[in-house]
């Protein structure tokens, strides 16, 4: 199951907040989605949020690998998680998420192929090479209210739902959209 939303482009004032929000929400075993939906409720095999960001557009999505019987219970729980006001996240969660993000950036600098990809992407998107320190400074500047701006923008955008397998237990797109406030 995939819930897809309009994202932001790399020039957006909430680009970095969107990246941090996605990481906090659904990147790794400590993420909110993994803990609530997989560990606590056992509704999925895998769950994560991510995004793709370009110079003129972007997408934000949540992926859930689940069975057709579990999808009926999954949708309301997933929507509840997406509806949580990011201002209620703790400062500790934000700090840990930023640290996780920064470790990934710095680890990537140790790989020649990752560094080449990063430099090429930076040059293509920004017409200049950007240092990891520049990126880290932008991540460090993100605050909880910025995460809420990103979350609100995501949920107010158009929703696309994609599913593989039996869909008799899957709600309509309109029904899912109504659950997202």
Segments from the language model and where they lie:
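Buried hydrophobic packing residues in well-ordered domains
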Residues: 3, 19-21, 37, 62, ...
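M16/insulysin-pitrilysin zinc metalloprotease superfamily fold
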Residues: 48, 52-111, 177-181
């Amino acid at each position: 199951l995939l819930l897809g939303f309009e994202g932001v482009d790399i020039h957006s004032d909430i680009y970095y907040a969107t990246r941090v929000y996605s990481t906090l929400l659904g990147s790794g075993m400590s993420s909110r989605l993994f803990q609530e939906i997989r560990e606590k409720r056992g509704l999925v095999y895998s769950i994560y949020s991510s995004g793709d960001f370009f110079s003129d557009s972007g997408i934000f999505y949540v992926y859930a690998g689940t069975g057709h019987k579990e999808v009926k219970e999954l949708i309301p729980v997933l929507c509840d998680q997406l509806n949580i006001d990011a201002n209620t996240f703790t400062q500790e969660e934000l700090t840990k998420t930023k640290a996780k993000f920064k470790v990934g950036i710095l680890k990537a600098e140790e790989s020649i192929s990752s560094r080449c990809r990063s430099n090429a992407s930076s040059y293509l998107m920004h017409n200049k090479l950007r240092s990891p320190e520049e990126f880290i400074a932008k991540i460090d500047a993100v605050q909880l209210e910025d995460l809420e701006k990103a979350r609100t923008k995501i949920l107010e955008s158009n929703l696309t739902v994609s599913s593989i397998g039996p869909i008799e237990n899957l709600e309509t797109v309109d029904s899912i959209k109504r659950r997202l406030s």
